[in-house]
Amino acid sequence: MAMPLTTAIDAWDKRWATVEGRADWLDPAPDVIALLPELKARGARTALDLGCGVGRHALFLAEHGLIVEAIDGSAAGLKFARETAQARGVSLGLQQATADALPFDEGSFDFVLSWNVIHHGSLGDVGRRLAEIWRVMKPGALYQGTMLPTRNINYGRGRTIAPDTFVVDGSERGHPHFYCDAATLVALFAGFELLSLTQQLHRKPGSWHWHIIAERRPL
């Protein structure tokens, strides 16, 4: 059974509702910017930003000519993304939804982005979300995303609620976080061809993340 994301969505709602909470989440990640030429070279037209937050990546992709759908569980994040898109004259398809049941047809997208999203849950949750992502991608489409390695400084902190899955109660990490080694990640991406797999630091010391680029394999 999938772990509920209620606590995570509540936390993001509170964060996205304030100027201070949004401040670090307004600019697209450098890796996403860097992938744009490859998307253009492949003729990508349709994109899904899965867990779009306040819309930083969805807006970037749309402003560079892609037809973008974006989902998030946070109403506050979607509200800010919608208002920003209107202010910039950018067209975005925005829906309140989660990665557990994507509201799109099979083979809808040339590109799916999932930045700091799918690891909120257990190993089984991540596997089900990747199956949903695979379903809505066209054969040969690109996936870009992040996950958490066991090298991350927060691995093992808090309550263990499933293998390699932890919750730190009373903190911003008060919802499940799943961590994995390279072998587990490769197994999770069995339906994809991994094109790039690196570990990179994010904002804080020890905040290692997997950075993934993969191509959807055909049936």
Model-derived segments and spans:
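A short glycine-rich, Lys/Arg-flanked "PGG" loop and its adjoining helix->strand segment in the class I
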Residues: G127-P139
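Class I (Rossmann-like) S-adenosyl-L-methionine-dependent methyltransferase catalytic domain
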Residues: A2-A44, V54-A101, D125, L142-L219
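A short beta-strand submotif of the Rossmann-like class I SAM-dependent methyltransferase core
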Residues: S114-V117
